[in-house]
Structures are given as C-alpha cells and as structure tokens.
Amino acid sequence: MTLTPRQAAVRSLAFKATTGERVSIPAESISDSYGAYVFNIEAQRKYLPGNVFKKLRRTISQGATLDPSIADSVANAMKNWAVSFGATHYSHWFQPMTGHTAEKQDSFITPTGTGTAILEFSGKELTQGEPDASSLPSGGIRVTFEARGYTAWDPMSPAFLRHSPNGVTLTIPTAFCSWTGDALDTKTPLLRSNAALDVQARRVLDLLSEPGEARAKRVFANVGAEQEFFLIDRELFYLRPDMMACGRTLFGAAPPKGQEQNDHYFATTPGRVLAFMQDLERHLWQLGIPIKTRHNEVAPAQYEMAPIYESVTVACDHNMLMMDLLHEVARAHGLKCLLHEKPYRGLNGSGKHNNYSVGTDLGHNLLDPGTNPHENLRFMIFLTALIAAVDKHQDLLRSTVASAGNDHRLGAHEAPPAIISVFMGSDLQGVIDALIAGEGHGKLDGGKLHLGVSSLPKLPRDTTDRNRTSPFAFTGNKFEFRAPGSSQSLAYPNYVLNTILAESLETIAEQIEALPKADRKNGGIQNVIRETLTLHKRILFPGDNYADAWTQEAEKRGLLNLRDTPAALGMLNDAKNVALFEKYSVLSEREWLSRTAIVSEAYMEKLRVEARVAIDMAATLFLPAGLRAQHKTADSLSAARGACEGLNLDVQINHLTKIANLISDLQESIDLLRERLGNPPVEPDPVA
C-alpha cells in the first residue's frame, strides 16, 4: 500500500527516539562555560592593556563617549581573542526594521603581496561598517540611487562568537543608520531613549536626595523577556505550505483533543523537547544569556523559556539572538520552532511578556517599594510617573504590539485585550486610593509608610496578586507588559516606555522644582503625587479585563479601544507623538514617519502573502481533492444504481450534492479573494 506524504511523516515519527538527540555536555560546570564565547569583562581584562581596559569599562559602565584613541587596541584584542577560538571572520550584527537580525561578514585576512596573508582587524573596521541601506526597510529614507548606510559599534552590548559547522565568526553588535544620519534600526532609538530616561530620572533623584547621600551617575531600564514558542516535527512542517510561507496554519480542522483538559501547562516536558531545551540552554549560557526558566505552556506543543533581567539594550539583543538560536537548535533536533503569535486556530497563541523596571548604577531598583521612608517616597514617585505615562500614551503603547500575527491573539481569552490598563494589586491600589482621598494613612499588616510628614501603609514586597488578564501589571518590583507578540523585537515597546516615562518624570520634576524648598518635604511632594494620580486614575483597573463589562467601563472612562492593527496604526502620526520623540531626541519627525510607513507596509504585505498562499492552496490542493471526491462519489452512486434497481440512494445523492455545492462555493471564494487581492505586487527595484 502506498503511503501518503502525511502517513509517511507520521510513521517516521514513531521510529524516532523519544528522548531526542543526546547532547554532549562539557565536563566543566555551567559557571565555567557561562559567557565563554563573549568578549566580556574577563576577556577584556586578559587581552586589553590596562589603560585601554579602564577606558573601555568607563564607556560601558557609565555610558561615557568612547575614546577614539583606543579603537585600534580594542579591535586587535578582540581579534586575538576571537582567533584563539578559531574565528576567521567578523560581522557587524544589527537589527534593521525587518523585525529580524542582519549582518555582513568579512574575513580577517589581509594579503601581504608575497603570496601569503596576515590576520588584521583595525579600529575603523570595528567601529564602522558600510552595508547597503536601500535594500532594507527605510520608509523612503534610502533608495537604490542613494543607498549608503553605516553600522556603528555599540560597546554597551558585548561582542560574541557564532559557531557554525565549518567555522567561527566574531559578531559585533552595532547600530544602523543612513548616510544622512537617520536611524534605520531598532537599536538606535532604544539607546537614545535610555539616554533621555537617564537625564530625567537623575533629575528627580537629585531632588529627592538626602545630604551626604551617594547620587546615581546613571539610570537605565532593565528588562526580562519571557519567550513563548511552539515546536513541530520538521517532516510535518514541510507538509504544510501555509506554515512554510506564513508561519501559521491558514486551513485545518480542530483536533479531537486540544487544551480542554488543561493538562499541558507545567506538565512533564517530553524527552525530545527537553533534549532540545537542554541543548539550547547550553548555547545560550555560552553566549552569556542568563536563561533561567523552562516549562510547558498552556497549548499542546507550546513552551516557554525566560532569562533573568538585564539592561534593556543587552536584553533586547539577547532576545533577538535567542530567537535565532531557537530556529538553529530546533533544526538540529529535527524540529521546527514556530514563533508566530497564533500558529493554530483554537489553541492559545504565543506572547513575549516584557518585564520592565528602572535601575541605577548604585544597584537600586526604582520600582521596588523599599524598606524605609526615603525608598518608599522614591518608589511612589516613579510608580506615579509610569502610571501617568501609560495613561497619557495609551495609543503609543498599543501601537508597539500591533501586527498581523498579534491581531489573532490580543483580545481573546488567552492574552490581554486591546484596551491598555494598569493593574496594581489590592494592597497597592489601597495605598493609591488613600493618597487620592487625602487620607493620612491606611492599614496594611499594622505598618505605616512615611512620605516626608504623612504616613501611609508599609508596603510589603509582594503587594499584588497575579492578574493575567491585565496588559500592564505591577508584579512587586517591576511592571509586566503582557501584550507583545512572540515574534517581535522588544526594542520598540521599550524605547516607547523609556520615552514616555522620561516625559512623565520631567513633568513631575518641574512641579517639584516649582515648590519652595521648605515645602517639598512638608507635604509638597506628596501633593504632587496625589494630583498626578488623581488625574490619571482612570487607567487603573483591578478586575477581569476579559469581561464585556470592562469594555463598557473603559469606554465610559475615555480609554482607547484600538481593536486591531489598522486602528492602532491610524493614531501613530498624531502631532503629539511626533513631538514627543523629537523633544527627547529619540526620533526625528522624518525617522518616526518612516517607521509608521514601514509598520503599515509590513502589515499589508503579511496579509497579501497569506491571501496568495490561501488562493494557491485552495486552487491546487483543495479544489482538485474536491473534484476527485465528487468523481469517486458519483462513480459509487452509478455503480449502486446499476447493481440493484430500486435502492434508496437519497443519502448518497445528498452527499454528492453537498460535495458539488462545496466545490462551487470554494471556486467562488477563490475568485472573490483573487479579485480583492487585485494585481500582483510590482517587482522591486533591481539591487546591484
């Protein structure tokens, strides 16, 4: 009997080892191999001259301008370190506005003129590269006859080594810009937004500082990203044209058993998947990515892996690298990793929770309630600032998670709704309510929190329950933004968060600075907090965000309900948004408008691709199958009639009629979709 391709694929699965590929774990401990392929502080100390090492560390730790005089020395040390691992090439690794990573690789060799070659790597080659900027999304900033672009070394994110079966490449994280200086990537505005946040956050901290208290020299955002994904055997994946082209199924029947019994979440991980995860963890640890957690997610074949938090630029780089490695390691295990937000209809989709906090170079988490009055006052100001920022810029925050894939996920009972709201937890909400009401204190475990002269309940570290329906939830010492999609870069949500928080902190700083110094500690700062919370309390919601009643309540409060990507993108070019990014030098008007054009075009192209794939599958797979079924049924009906006259064949006739009607409906749907899709896309400009 001849097997169908699907039957052959399923049969092959039965003979695959359930434990997957065995990973050869090195004899050394994790602590010895962690960061082994990263040009980290230990490698820098070993390979750099002492004075160069100190200057480079000052740039990295304090955000100081890089001293150009050390570039050659750093480049040579980086090259020597990489060559010691067998590296032959280097690349400037950047994140264009495709949502993926990009690079161009060059070798270290320099011909000597005598038929030999030496290995060289100059400071100029380290600090600047020159890729073609017109072949990547630019929103009209770069075109084919104006194609020059530059990559610039980002010393804040360490260089690392990428291994392939036939070699090793030194990979250098970089920013990407045009010849005119316009940012063409996601990293550049993230770095700029961190600088804006640093200025305004230190301004507020200086206003709160006590005599003799050490002052922060640098403030920055920290992020921990929870990455969700699906796994499928590669043989089954390649049987699906829709999954190959779109990353999700466009057609299909629901399985007899999905996630109804809630028996997959946190269940024992299958051996083959666990082998994949262990192999992936080893690669991640060697690259200095602090992966911490692994577990089954809610849907069958869905999983999650999450790292410990890092500074926002490094965290975003590491998440992009992790997504690359998810695909690479899955391939080695005969699996395919699906990062689409909704690969299967009827099953939970995948997200990427963005855990956001703000820290200082002194080790303080400014979103931690703390243990004394000074820390609690600082916490309440930064908490208030972020609440105000989210309320004022709901549209921007919603736009950061707008995509064709995420539209299938947001608003279903598996992810936060499209309405942005903030959850604080009952205890902290009580503190906020007491402040707004002007009450001197409330009760919480019998303790009190002192804000200058007034008292409020002492805040325990775990002040919240977990409201998994909330898009923006406080979780004890950070905010968890739960709306980002699993496949997206986290740079966009985080440079928006940094920028809107910087604006909010500046507003609060101006209000405090306007107070007489004697009044600041005598209830003045508390009044600023109260007035700000009163103005923005509408964004706070402690209940079920899935409930229909919340949609109605949100409308009464004047909150935005941007249900899909077109609605969210429709507000991006509002004057207030353009002015915000220009004010804090995060993005110019030209840069911002180019991004909105790119996001809109990406959304439309995604839908066009899905439409073309749907037409192709329907016309070449389903329609012929329907015609074959019709022919087979008609032959069967004719044979039955010829074999015995007088048989009751109503059921068979109805079945044949149903098949014929379905074929007719399918052809009409194909024609209609072709008509709505319109003409095929114009061929792109030739690229030299």
Residue ranges, per PLM feature:
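Residue-level "edge-of-site" marker
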Residues: 72, 95, 124, 296-297, ...
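N-terminal hydrophobic targeting/anchoring segments and the immediately downstream early-domain regions
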Residues: 2-27, 144-152, 158-160, 164
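Histidine/acidic residue-rich metal-binding segments in metalloenzymes
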Residues: 15-123, 127-146
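Short, solvent-exposed linear motifs at loop/edge-of-secondary-structure regions
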Residues: 63-64, 69-99, 220, 225-233, ...
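C-terminal amphipathic alpha-helical interaction region
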Residues: 532-688
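Short linear, low-complexity motifs centered on an aromatic residue
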Residues: 99-114, 128, 133-134, 240-242, ...
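Short, intrinsically disordered, low-complexity segments enriched in Ser/Thr and Pro
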Residues: 110-144, 262, 385-387, 509-519, ...
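Glycine-rich, acidic/polar active-site loops that bind/position phosphate-bearing ligands
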Residues: 148-339, 348-351, 358-599
